[in-house]
A protein has these predicted regions:
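Short helix-coil transition sites and intra-membrane helix breaks within transmembrane domains
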Residues: 16-25, 150-158
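Membrane-interface alpha-helices at helix entry/exit sites of multi-pass transporters
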Residues: 39-47, 70-76, 170-181
Length: 260
């Protein structure tokens, strides 16, 4: 029963992830934490595998659809995302030796919930201040920050990615959604490789993993198609509603974890 529930959550999450730039993990992680069936490291791994699979299928869909992508920019920001992904994964592994599963889940929920609230507020401010960073070092540093946050929190980082891309590079939300998925690919790749090298891959049911990956691939393909067809207003509205709801879930997880 829980496998089917995981599949539905992952499909919806990755569909929205590719559609409006949510990434998927930002939905998967708090909802699987809320269900409470698996430990935090297992949830993080399932989320990373699902989001990584989504990013591959979604990016391939955009390439085939001839979506306009600045590959040089994507490569530069992804270099930072890889470095940040390794650092974030290492910090998570270290904190897991200090805090118990419930406490660390609460800390993650508090940080993610706060970042989501900031994202919703900023992206809905009319004529909000934006920058247009062109320097390669600056682009790498932004990517590093995104990779670190995503990897440490066990999410793709979609809403945070979109906010950073809009703020630092003056992108539209529609364009930011495409580049968000690209950076997610590299940050999650570095996280999974780091786990493999360190031998910290948790014991996960093969059935759960297969269901997660298949649902994520399908969600990524359909979400990328919808992104191509939809306008900025639709994407912004869906993004705002979903992220606001996720902030509430994360604060609930934080409250449950920190007072346990």
């Amino acid at each position: 029963m829980y496998v089917a529930l995981y599949g539905v959550i992952i499909f919806v999450a990755t569909f929205l992830g590719a559609f409006v730039g949510l990434g998927g993990g930002v939905i998967i992680k708090p909802l699987l934490d809320l269900i409470g069936y698996d430990t935090i490291n297992v949830v993080n791994f399932i989320s990373a595998c699902a989001v990584f699979s989504m990013s591959i299928s979604s990016t391939i869909k955009h390439i085939r659809a001839k979506t306009k992508i600045d590959y040089k920019f994507l490569l530069i920001i992804s270099i930072g995302a890889v470095i940040g992904g390794v650092a974030g994964s290492s910090l998570f592994d270290y904190l897991l030796t200090i805090f118990d599963n419930t406490m660390l889940k609460g800390i993650q929920g508090l940080i993610l919930g706060t970042l989501l609230v900031i994202s919703v507020i900023y992206l809905n401010i009319k004529n909000a201040k934006k920058f247009n960073v062109k320097n390669n070092v600056g682009i790498v540093l932004v990517g590093l920050s995104l990779g670190f946050i995503a990897s440490f929190l066990g999410v793709g980082g979609g809403p945070i990615n979109v906010t950073f891309l809009v703020f630092f590079f003056s992108m539209t939300m529609k364009d930011a959604a495409v580049y968000s998925v690209g950076t997610i690919f590299f940050s999650q790749l570095s996280k999974l490789v780091t786990m493999g090298i360190k031998g910290t891959v948790p014991d996960v049911s093969a059935v759960v993993l297969i269901v997660a990956i298949v649902c994520a691939i399908i969600g990524g393909l359909l979400g990328a198609r919808m992104n191509k067809r939809s306008d900025e207003k639709v994407i912004k509205t869906i993004f705002t509603i979903v992220v606001a709801a996720l902030a509430v879930v994360n604060y609930y997880n934080a409250f449950s974890g920190l007072i346990a």
